[in-house]
């Protein structure tokens, strides 16, 4: 009886645990193909309003490409303080609409209005802070850890970046992971991140 129970336990461990870990690994991850499909359909707002885990290569590629285009080599800096009675005490910094202090070379207020966050919640990355990190080449450091990004910043970067890459093509995520390098949905093939993509998705 003990031998039989042990055998059943081994079988459960062999088959159930890998499946459980696989589901943990892929749950709520938005793939490149899924993002592009959502951008193309105009449904991006739906995913940026909720907590979503984005694979690092997608997030990094979109943010680096988008903000490098906007930077144009200029110096962007976040003064690291909030306004106090409408005043910033760091030299060269001024108070923005969201009670955050920015350097004189930061983006104009008209751009900030769309993307900055009013909240000073811990770990929120503002537009100025992102651009500073992108400019310094340190983007890898923030995409490897849990970071709260304001929805307008994320939406702007992803929509802008992926709309450039889409070119009107049909993008679809096959909704399955590769199994032994194979995808079983017709017209789908295995990509670099062990996820299946349709024929018209971006080249991996």
From Swiss-Prot:
Any single GO BP term: killing of cells of another organism
PTM description: Proteolytically processed in two steps to yield first two linear precursors, and then two cyclic peptides after removal of the N-terminal repeats (NTR) and short tails.
Cross-link (Cyclopeptide (Gly-Asn)): 73-105, 168-200
Signal peptide, first to last residue: 1-22
Disulfide links within the chain: 79-93, 83-95, 88-101, 174-188, 178-190, 183-196
Keyword Ion transport recorded: no
UniProt propeptide residues: 23-72, 106-118, 119-167, 201-204
Keywords for this protein: Cytolysis, Disulfide bond, Hemolysis, Knottin, Plant defense, Repeat, Signal
Record InterPro entries: Cyclotide, Cyclotide_moebius_CS, Cyclotide_sf
Keyword Disulfide bond in record: yes
Function, in words: Probably participates in a plant defense mechanism. Has a weak hemolytic activity.
UniProt family annotation: Belongs to the cyclotide family.
Domain text: The presence of a 'disulfide through disulfide knot' structurally defines those proteins as knottins.
Additional facts recorded: Tricyclon-A and tricyclon-B are hybrids of the Bracelet and Moebius subfamilies.
The protein's name in its UniProt record: Pro-tricyclons
